C-alpha cells in the first residue's frame, strides 16, 4: 500500500499493489508526504508528515482495508521518521524525524487493541429467523514515549518489529549532514552498531 506523497503539492492518494498492478482506493483524510508507516494491506497506519513545507503533522490514520480513520496522534508533529514496516497496524515504532526546526531522537511505540468492525451476534427467537448485527467501538489505540535513539536524524531507514529493529542513515545536525549511524533496538533500548560507509 502507498499513501500520500507530493507532486507540486501534498496529495491524499492511496494505492494498493496486487502483484501485477496498482489500484486506487480510499484516500487518506489529510494530504501529506514524508510520513512514517507500518503494516500493509489490508491493515496499516500512516503517521506524521508534512502538508506543505514547514507545516508538520502529528496525526495517525488507520487503514482497515476499506477506509482511513484518524486515531491517536504522535506526541509531537514530525516528518521523515523511520518509514520501514516496524510491525503492523497494531504495533509499531516511530523513530527520529524532523519537527520542522530540528532532527530529533525521540521514539514512540504504537499499540492498538484488536478491532472488530462487526461482531456478529446471533439470538434465537422462537419461530423466527431474526439476526442482530452489532457495531462495537474498541478504544485504546495510543502512542507512548519510550527510550530515545542516540542520534537525532530524519529521513532514516529502518526495518524490524516493535521488539527487534534497526534504524540507519538519515540526515541531521546543523548544518544538515548525512548520518552514517546504525542503531539496534532490543525492545527496551538503542545500541549503536557499525556505521555505514557514506
Q: Which stretches of residues belong to each language-model region?
A:
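Polar, enzyme-active/binding microenvironments
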Residues: 1-198
Amino acid at each position: 500500500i502507498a499513501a500520500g506523497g507530493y507532486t507540486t503539492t501534498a496529495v491524499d492518494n492511496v494505492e494498493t499493489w496486487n502483484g501485477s498492478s496498482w489500484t486506487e482506493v480510499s484516500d487518506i483524510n489529510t494530504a501529506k508526504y514524508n510520513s512514517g508507516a507500518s503494516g500493509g494491506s489490508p491493515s496499516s497506519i500512516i503517521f506524521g508528515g508534512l502538508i506543505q513545507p514547514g507545516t508538520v503533522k502529528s496525526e495517525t490514520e488507520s487503514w482497515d482495508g476499506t477506509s482511513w480513520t484518524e486515531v491517536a496522534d504522535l506526541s509531537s508533529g514530525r516528518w521523515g521518521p523511520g518509514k520501514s514496516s516496524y510491525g503492523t497496524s497494531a504495533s509499531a515504532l516511530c523513530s527520529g524525524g524532523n519537527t520542522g526546526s530540528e532532527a530529533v531522537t525521540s521514539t514512540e511505540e504504537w499499540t492498538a487493541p484488536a478491532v472488530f468492525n462487526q461482531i456478529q451476534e446471533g439470538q434465537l427467537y422462537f419461530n423466527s429467523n431474526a439476526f442482530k448485527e452489532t457495531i462495537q467501538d474498541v478504544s485504546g489505540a495510543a502512542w507512548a514515549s519510550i527510550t530515545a535513539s542516540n542520534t537525532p536524524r530524519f529521513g532514516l531507514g529502518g526495518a524490524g518489529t516493535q521488539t527487534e529493529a534497526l534504524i540507519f542513515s538519515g540526515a541531521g545536525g546543523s548544518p544538515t549532514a548525512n548520518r552514517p549511524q546504525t542503531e539496534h533496538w532490543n525492545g527496551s533500548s538503542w545500541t549503536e552498531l557499525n556505521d555505514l560507509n557514506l
